[in-house]
Curated annotation (Swiss-Prot):
InterPro entries with a match to the protein in the record: NRAMP_fam
Organism: Staphylococcus epidermidis (strain ATCC 35984 / DSM 28319 / BCRC 17069 / CCUG 31568 / BM 3577 / RP62A)
Upper lineage: Bacteria, Bacillati, Bacillota, Bacilli, Bacillales
Classification via PANTHER family: NATURAL RESISTANCE-ASSOCIATED MACROPHAGE PROTEIN 2, SOLUTE CARRIER PROTEIN FAMILY 11 MEMBER
Single annotated GO MF: symporter activity
Chief location category: membrane
Transmembrane segments: 39-59, 66-86, 114-134, 146-166, 175-195, 217-237, 270-290, 310-330, 362-382, 388-408, 427-447
Protein name: Divalent metal cation transporter MntH
NCBIfam families on file: nramp, Nramp_1, PRK00701.1
Keyword Transport: yes
């Protein structure tokens, strides 16, 4: 790691504040009651949870349930616990140092290497955006019959919707994201209830099974679930937005309080994401496991399978499939909001460059829409090819993941930077193991994906 330049004399006062327009804007009084402090910090975790229930996770979870029943619920549990640990590290990084992960990575690396990391981070955000464009465009097609190419172009106007919402303050964004998340949650709770899953089999799914390792097919889906869980942009995002609360930046006690309640918020919201992913897998298992429709390839397959499932009947099948599309649209809109903020954090953090938000968002979304449009034109609207592009975007995110995880680990284990908030030894051991395992699994997934082409 010869490129790493540890700057022991870090000075937070010389560092531009992360997301300056929202930084230190939301009241937090450490003298309030525990419930008031919790409510003050409730919100950033919602934006982070979006990345754990994005369109890329949907196919993997439902296909896992359809093909292998409830066996992979254990993998969702382990993935969610790993996510909680890594996101708690970003919380401590942001609050303890006053820097987000992009700023900290720039602080760690010499300029040429930092620029390389910035390019990878930007490409990761574009890859994330591609999934959002595809998910939203497919949802618009399923609900309203809007052609995919028109739906993809419509998503460009999400830029202006977010800019309009931002005028009303960051709390409003948190509220809107929370509303959309609970819309998705409510839809899948209803759909799972209607599908009448076997509760005993569900509970048994949280127990590790040797088939996860011995069965090649189960292992591949398991790796897909794990590899898609930790999103690079979430690590940048979370380390910044936790700084939106007002607390004394020079008080160790107030920082400790802020870290405590921000971590509680994160764990609660990631628990909701865990439930949503379990519901997706359960829905796939309850309706399609052991049937001829168990090989669900994409959103259109899922929609059609729900609509025509004999056990549901025509009316209920129509309702279930429509609600599925509505949830997909809500998920896409949520990811738009978080992707915008993450893009701004990355550009400002790595380059110390601020451009108008509307221009930043327009550039990112345009770069995401262009590959989708080209794919639609070249393959004449072939839905299978457009969903394959979504898979490619997830593969690139897997490649980009170590470039955000390693700086996070190095920073949070550094005494000079973190002071009393540095990683404990057991956290260092687990986080390095996670980095090695996740990186190895992602490499395996990438190889498998290209072999299947």
């Amino acid at each position: 790691m010869g490129v790493i330049l540890l700057n022991s004399n870090n000075n937070n006062h010389e560092q531009q504040r992360s997301l300056d327009e929202i930084n230190n804007t939301i009241n937090f009084n450490h003298n309030d009651s525990a419930s008031q402090k919790f409510l003050a910090f409730l919100g950033p975790g919602l934006l982070v949870a979006v990345g754990y229930m994005d369109p890329g996770n949907w196919i993997t979870s439902m296909q896992g349930g359809a093909q292998y029943g409830y066996t992979l619920l254990f993998i969702i549990l382990i993935s969610s616990l790993s996510a909680m640990l890594l996101q708690s590290m970003t919380v401590r990084l942001g609050i303890a140092t006053g820097m987000d992960l992009a700023q900290m990575t720039r602080h760690f690396l010499n300029k040429p290497v930092a620029i390389m990391f910035w390019i990878i981070a930007e490409l990761a955000i574009i890859a994330t955006d591609i999934a959002e464009v595809i998910g939203s465009a497919i949802a618009l097609d399923l609900i309203f019959g809007i052609p995919l190419i028109v739906g993809a172009l419509i998503t460009v106007f999400d830029v202006f919707l977010l800019l309009f919402i931002m005028k009303f303050g960051f709390r409003k964004i948190e509220a809107i994201v929370g509303t959309l998340i609970f819309t998705v949650l409510a839809i899948f709770v209803f759909e799972v209830y209607i599908s009448s899953p076997q509760i005993t089999d569900m509970l048994n799914g949280f127990v590790p099974h040797k088939e996860i390792i011995t069965n090649q097919g189960i292992l591949y889906i398991a790796l897909g679930i794990i590899g898609a869980t930790i999103m690079p942009h979430n690590l940048y995002l979370h380390s910044s937005i936790v700084q939106s609360r007002k607390y004394d930046r020079h008080s160790i006690h107030e920082k400790a309080q802020a870290i405590k309640y921000a971590t509680i918020d994160s764990n609660i919201q990631l628990s909701i994401a865990f439930v949503v992913n379990c519901l997706l897998l359960t829905l796939g298992a309850a309706l399609f496991f052991g049937t001829k429709t168990e090989d669900l390839g994409g959103f259109y397959d899922l929609y059609l399978a729900l609509k025509t499932e004999p056990a549901l009947g025509a009316t209920l099948g129509g309702i279930m499939s429509t609600l599925f599309a509505v949830a997909l649209l809500a998920s896409g809109q949520n990811s738009t909001i978080t992707g915008t903020l993450a893009g701004q954090i990355v550009m400002e953090g790595f380059l110390k460059l601020s451009i108008p938000n509307w221009l930043r968002r327009l550039i990112t979304r345009s770069l995401a829409v262009i590959p989708v449009i080209i794919c639609l034109i070249v393959f004449k609207g072939n839905t299978e090819k457009i969903e394959q592009l979504l898979v490619f975007s997830q593969v690139f995110l897997s490649i980009a993941l170590p470039f955000s995880l390693i700086p996070l680990q190095l920073a949070t284990s550094n005494q000079n930077l973190m002071g009393p908030f540095k990683n404990k030894t057991w956290i260092n051991i687990i986080s390095w193991l996670l980095i090695i395992v996740l990186s190895g699994l992602n490499v395996y997934l990438i190889i498998q994906t290209f072999q299947e082409l």
